[in-house]
């Protein structure tokens, strides 16, 4: 979690965090990101009105959970969590999942 929050603005660092995950965790996350990448295609956004920012806002709390009980920390990290997920949707290469999804 802390690495995700620390690298929420850097596509290269965010992708490196994903590649450092255990294989099964990485595969599940890549599957989810691939699914979200399908949704952010312009034809789908035109119908759903769910662009990359909206999807990141909805999905970030399901992927990243702040361990702090301090509301200020939780509030500050929420923006970083959404940014991290948005970066992954925009930059993570999930082409190897092509036949799976």
From Swiss-Prot:
Entry-linked InterPro entries: Rho_GTPase_activation_prot (IPR008936), RhoGAP_dom (IPR000198)
Single GO cellular component term: glutamatergic synapse
Tissue: Preoptic area and testis.
Residues marked Arginine finger (site): 1
Highest taxon above the source species: Eukaryota
One Pfam family this sequence matches: RhoGAP
Gene Ontology BP term (one): postsynapse organization
Domain Rho-GAP, residue spans: 1-96
Cited PANTHER family: FI04035P, RHO GTPASE-ACTIVATING PROTEIN 39
Name of the protein in its database record: Rho GTPase-activating protein 39
Source organism of the structure: Rattus norvegicus (Rat)
Taxonomic placement: Eukaryota, Metazoa, Chordata, Craniata, Vertebrata
Originating gene: Arhgap39
